Regions:
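Structural recognition of the beta-strand scaffold that forms the well-ordered cores
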Residues: 75, 203-208, 212, 242-248, ...
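Oxyanion-hole/transition-state-stabilizing segment in secreted/luminal serine hydrolases
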Residues: 38, 213, 217, 249-304
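N-terminal secretory targeting modules
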Residues: 22-207, 217-220, 238
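Glycine- and acidic-residue-enriched helix-capping/strand-helix junction motifs
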Residues: 214-227
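Alpha-helical scaffolding within the catalytic cores
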Residues: 60, 188, 226-233, 259-275, ...
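Catalytic His-Asp segment of secreted/periplasmic serine-dependent ester chemistry enzymes
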Residues: 290, 328-416
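Bacterial N-terminal signal peptides
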Residues: 8-18
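C-terminal outer-membrane/trafficking sorting elements
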Residues: 418-430, 434-508
């Protein structure tokens, strides 16, 4: 028997290797998470921005948008949040846009919803498509074409698209171009695109108003300041894995009034609950300040804005998101300006700049103000006294310090420095090989339902180490393999949209 032992051991080893490879393929031996590459903030569409005739019911709508980061798998979210009745999408296609209403038909893919082509969104709800393989490259223009069934008289959308959409009668979702279509510079129902990306990938979410939304930028030019910021991130090797989510709404207020849901009411939806957000930029408040007309109102509005910002900070830190405040830019020459609104603006900006409040400051006021009249925008950067022109947007987007978005281990929360867990991490077990016990460590960046299971080489569960809701933190679990045979095993961490599998070896 001695002469046969090495051969038997070799066969067993090869068998384990083969089974290991098969199981690794089955459960996914890669670390991927869902990360936002594009968003637009849904709102109730005002009467003047409704879809033009022939309307959406039983017709096709082609909408073009530019993503930030790329990926090979995506999913799309659609919103009917502000409509009062159901909206049916009979068919939805996504393709590479080649300019105007034209698409590359070889890239056209149908989106499905729980395996179905048709989906009906109830009033007040949103839906997300099934994941599909799609070769999405950074800053790619894509076209989403929807063939509608019944639609609502109240429409959910985003009026400030700065991008042309196309409406044509009937079902033309697979048509190369929409020749003869009615055009409109608004988006309807589309809300977000996520990509499946390595766990090191992340995104920045921006809460803003019309200056973030790009009023005064070029229609179809993709030259809002968040677009310029995205370009800068993608050019730098240390930040090219970071997406940008522009959640600006024109006319939006932080506190009350204005257009769309207020910043306070939409903050969770648009910022902390977006997929893959590691940083947030708050650049909103000018529409609240613009209504100030007395010293008392200046004091009250400044205090209320600061209290809202504090809420934003608390919520961001609870999700381990670094949050940066952007100072309010000048607006002398616009109807918003008076001595009291200027006092309010300066009070708010002083708080934003003060260390220990936000995790950092992006000082747009400093770079955009006229040195000869600091209440005004630089003459060559302004559009109407309030909104920058394209040169101003380029200045804003290119001025942001990219070091704010490199991987750091700590951030300052008030006066305390705390360890920040940036991403899901599954460590290699130790010791490995082991007999009979080993320890597995893992980290979760935000409160998540966590599953940590051990599998044998055939994919059968042999132990469940964790199956419950855990707060953000780093954890370790010991696995005692007493009574199990020597060989290769696998452990898999499932938390939120994160999945990772690793191998461990029991050697007796």
């Amino acid at each position: 028997m001695k002469n046969f032992t090495p051969f038997v051991v070799m066969l067993v080893s090869l068998e384990f290797i083969s089974l290991s490879q098969s199981f690794a393929t089955l459960v996914g031996d890669t670390t991927k998470i869902w990360v936002g590459t594009w968003t637009t903030a849904p709102q109730l569409v005002e009467p003047g921005n409704m879809p033009p005739s022939p309307g959406l019911t039983n017709n096709s709508l082609r909408q073009v948008l530019e993503v930030s980061i790329g990926g090979d798998t995506l999913r799309v979210r659609f919103s009917n949040e502000f409509s009062t009745s159901t909206v049916t999408m009979n068919s939805v296609q996504i393709a590479v846009s080649t300019g105007g209403s034209t698409i590359d038909t070889s890239t056209n893919r149908e989106l499905k919803f729980n395996g179905n082509s048709q989906v009906t969104m109830s009033a007040g709800t949103a839906v997300t498509s099934d994941p599909i393989a799609f070769n999405l490259t950074p800053r790619m223009d894509v076209a989403i074409t929807i063939y509608y069934g019944q639609t609502s008289s109240s429409v959910t959308g985003h009026p400030g698209s700065r991008t042309t959409s196309y409406i044509i009668a009937g079902n033309t979702t697979t048509t190369t171009d929409f020749t003869g279509a009615v055009t409109t510079d608004h988006w309807y129902n589309i809300s977000a695109i996520d990509v499946l990306a390595p766990s090191t990938t992340a995104c920045v979410a921006i809460l803003g108003n019309s200056i973030a939304d790009g009023r005064g930028s070029t229609t179809n030019g993709q030259n809002r300041w968040p677009d310029i910021f995205s370009e800068a991130l993608l050019r730098d090797s240390s930040t090219q894995h970071i997406g940008v989510l522009n959640q600006g709404i024109g006319g939006n207020c932080v506190l009350f009034g204005g257009l769309g849901p207020t910043g306070v009411s939409r903050y969770d939806r648009d910022i902390v609950n977006q997929n893959g957000v590691r940083w947030a930029i708050i650049f909103e408040g000018v529409n609240d300040i613009g209504g100030v007309s007395s010293s008392t109102a200046a004091t009250n509005t400044a205090n209320n804005l600061i209290n809202a910002y504090k809420q934003f900070i608390t919520k961001a830190h609870a999700k381990n998101i670094r949050i940066y405040g952007a100072t309010i830019t000048p607006f002398k020459g616009n109807g918003y300006y008076n001595q009291y609104s200027e006092l309010c603006r300066n009070t708010v900006n002083q708080w934003i700049r003060t260390a220990g409040n936000y995790d950092g400051c992006i000082d747009f006021d400093k770079i955009m103000r006229n040195p000869l009249d600091t209440a005004s925008l630089v003459t060559t950067y302004q559009n109407d006294g309030l909104h920058p022109d394209t040169a101003g947007y380029r200045k804003m987007g290119s001025s942001i310090d990219l070091n704010l978005f490199t991987a750091l281990d700590t951030t300052t929360l008030g006066v305390h420095s705390v360890r920040i867990i940036d991403s899901y991490v599954l460590g290699q077990n130790y010791p490995n090989p082991f007999n009979p016990a080993t320890t597995i460590s893992f980290s979760v960046p935000t409160q998540s339902f966590v599953s940590l299971k051990i599998y044998d080489a055939l994919g059968r569960v042999v132990s469940i180490l964790v199956s419950k809701l855990l707060s953000a933190g780093t954890y370790s679990r010991q696995w005692d393999a007493k009574g199990l045979a020597s060989g290769v095993y696998f452990y898999r961490l499932l938390a939120g949209s994160f999945i990772e599998t690793k191998k461990l070896v029991l050697l007796r």
